Amino acid sequence: MIKRRQTRRIYVGGVSIGDGAPVRVQSMTKTDTRNIKATIRQIKQLELAGCEIVRVAVPDITAAKVLGEIKKRIKIPMIADIHFNYKLALEAIKQGVDGLRINPGNIGAKWKVREVITAAKDRKIPIRIGVNAGSLPKDLIEKYGHPTHEAMVEAAERHIEILEELDFHDIKVSLKASDVMKTVEAYRLFSSKHDYPLHIGITETGPVPEGVVKSSIGIGLLLLEGIGDTIRVSLTDSPVVEVNVAYEILRVTGFREKGVEIISCPTCGRCEVNIKKMVKQVKNALRNVKEPIKVAVMGCSVNGPGEAKEADFGIAGGKGQGIVFVKGKILKTVKETELVNALIEEIRK
């Protein structure tokens, strides 16, 4: 059992974060927030996928003023992503958002920061300090020579100090870079010094499969060291794909189990069925199952049921026919064309 780092408890809406709460899955909309219908539609898709917290970009006052309308029509907590303009943060709070992603050192004079913090305190809204290696202060780049993990942590500490001076402690922190090991080292260093909950992820990872690999290694490494309270997989793809990958990372690292885990053989010269097609059919048929079950789709009797005996349900194909098995025990033999349907029927019993 992995011992998680002890962090403070905060709440984003009704979702608990830190202090032993489950590692939460976040994503971010990729719509123009000002397009209310499109944004709500995408958030509802994220809700169906199991997303627990959603972040939306707030580029201007028009976007800020539609947040309340969006909030009314979604179920999960919503975080407003604010840069530079304190008035956008104040409007987002007024509209009823559940959290802010804002760097207080970037929004101007102290009185502006104080206004935002006072409003956040009154509404019990947490703030995520989001440090990105690509946008560190110039003096830190000069001090360290380039965007090092130490520079990232120092940048976060500057923002934290501003909030703590105003007696604000409802804080979550992220320290992201597109370089996996730089990100990991930044989180390691920060977590050795502070107990604020951490939102972890690798930024700008790119498309599938590159982004999935980078995110899985970076997030997985941190989780296995007990670091991380919320995660977001950043991909040049649908946010639903981000959520699906996030849950797979949590499943593999042993933190959360949700839905169907499919194990299937890579195929070899013994395989006489179209495994790729069968896996696709099984995934599609079981896509709405929420209970954690393991399903095996194997290409021959060598791989199934023997090598897949830990699966709750499974099939193993052969030329013209195949077997259906449960917990490694063969239930029946059916025609090859009936294998997938027989498996689905057994699961739904």
Swiss-Prot record:
Pfam families, per database record: GcpE
Gene3D superfamilies, alphabetized: Dihydropteroate synthase-like, Sulfite Reductase Hemoprotein, domain 1
Positions contributing to [4Fe-4S] cluster binding: C265, C268, C300, E307
EC number from the UniProt entry: 1.17.7.3
Enzyme class: oxidoreductase
Keywords assigned by UniProt, alphabetized: 4Fe-4S, Iron, Iron-sulfur, Isoprene biosynthesis, Metal-binding, Oxidoreductase
Gene Ontology terms for molecular function: 4 iron, 4 sulfur cluster binding; 4-hydroxy-3-methylbut-2-en-1-yl diphosphate synthase activity (ferredoxin); 4-hydroxy-3-methylbut-2-enyl-diphosphate synthase activity (flavodoxin); iron ion binding
Alphabetical GO biological process terms: isopentenyl diphosphate biosynthetic process, methylerythritol 4-phosphate pathway; terpenoid biosynthetic process
Involved pathway(s): Isoprenoid biosynthesis; isopentenyl diphosphate biosynthesis via DXP pathway; isopentenyl diphosphate from 1-deoxy-D-xylulose 5-phosphate: step 5/6
Catalysed reaction, written as an equation: (2E)-4-hydroxy-3-methylbut-2-enyl diphosphate + oxidized [flavodoxin] + H2O + 2 H(+) = 2-C-methyl-D-erythritol 2,4-cyclic diphosphate + reduced [flavodoxin]
Cofactor: [4Fe-4S] cluster
Cofactor comment text: Binds 1 [4Fe-4S] cluster.
SUPFAM superfamilies per the UniProt record, alphabetical: Inosine monophosphate dehydrogenase (IMPDH), Nitrite and sulphite reductase 4Fe-4S domain-like
InterPro entries: Dihydropteroate_synth-like_sf, IspG_bac, IspG_bac-typ, NO2/SO3_Rdtase_4Fe4S_sf
UniProt cross-references to HAMAP family, sorted A to Z: IspG
NCBIfam families registered for this protein in UniProt: ispG_gcpE (TIGR00612), PRK00366.1 (NF001540)
Biological function: Converts 2C-methyl-D-erythritol 2,4-cyclodiphosphate (ME-2,4cPP) into 1-hydroxy-2-methyl-2-(E)-butenyl 4-diphosphate.
Family to which this protein belongs: Belongs to the IspG family.
Protein name: 4-hydroxy-3-methylbut-2-en-1-yl diphosphate synthase (flavodoxin)
